[in-house]
Amino acid sequence: MEANPESLTAPMVRDIWALGVNRLSLGVQSFDDEVLSILGRAHDAEAARAAVRAARERFENVSVDLMCGIPGQSEESFAESVREAVALGANHVSVYPLTIEPHTPFDAAIMRGEMLEPDEDAEAAAMEEAQRILEDAGFHRYEVASYARPGFESRHNTAYWTGKPYLGLGRSAVTMTQNAERRMRVQDGQVVDDLNARQMAAEDLMLGMRMARGVSDKQVARAAAVIDGTETGGGTRLAAAAFESEGGSVLAAFDELADLGLVEHADGRWRPTDAGWLCGNELYGRLLDLAP
């Protein structure tokens, strides 16, 4: 279950626990009052701390969401927020760079020249610092934005990256359903995503590369059979010529990404490198382009 710090109280935590919820994810974003004010959040740093402490009274499985790349956020402010999440007992931490959405106050401020666009180099440095702090504290990075102590990886997150169907309940919630030939995402009664089999295969490769374990040679071969119309056998790393088609070669795409240092191949799997995660748009875009 997800909650914001300003709405989470100790009695609510007890009630949620009694209902059978086994994990709480808190949208903290920062433990710095100035940064929270810039974001326009309804909670302050002390409320965030209180929410994490309240959650830990009942839940062992507590996750904290943090953001980097926020205007006015110093490197030390962000690093201290990561350290504080660990100190408060979170066993799962997700770190996201600020995304400027169209028609938002930040977007308007940038258009007026009142604010600079997020610095991608600064965001990358912040993500690397978060990784260092969390790994030193015993966390491991199991997917692009999330770190967990062993046994506390999010099954919810993993379901997205492994193509598991899901049901969304409530306003703006998204449902994903699929069969062998079609994948659809539906929001508020409207189809917002409708993929054919080739696009599904490309998306599965892209989603798989959001996880540390990446994708196996067997997964790549199966995707190639669908995307390039090439039936392949076994799970070995096949020659690029076997996958060539007018739409591009699946294995050639991975080889190109490897040449760029964005992926690596070992032990029968293709995995993203740290550089690949930092350059996610290039990595994911190349795989999605296999079946536009």
What are these regions (language model features)?
Residues 133, 256, 286:
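Solvent-exposed, charged/polar functional surfaces in cytosolic regulatory/catalytic domains
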Residues 2-244, 292:
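C-terminal scaffold of the Radical SAM
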Residues 246-248, 268:
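Mobile late-domain/C-terminal helix-loop "cap" segments
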Residues 275-292:
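Short, amphipathic alpha-helical interaction segments positioned at domain boundaries
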Residues 269-273:
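Minor-groove-contacting beta-hairpin "wing" of winged helix-turn-helix DNA-binding domains
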Residues 249-260:
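Basic amphipathic alpha-helical segments that dock to polyanions
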Residues 258-268:
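A short, conserved structural fragment
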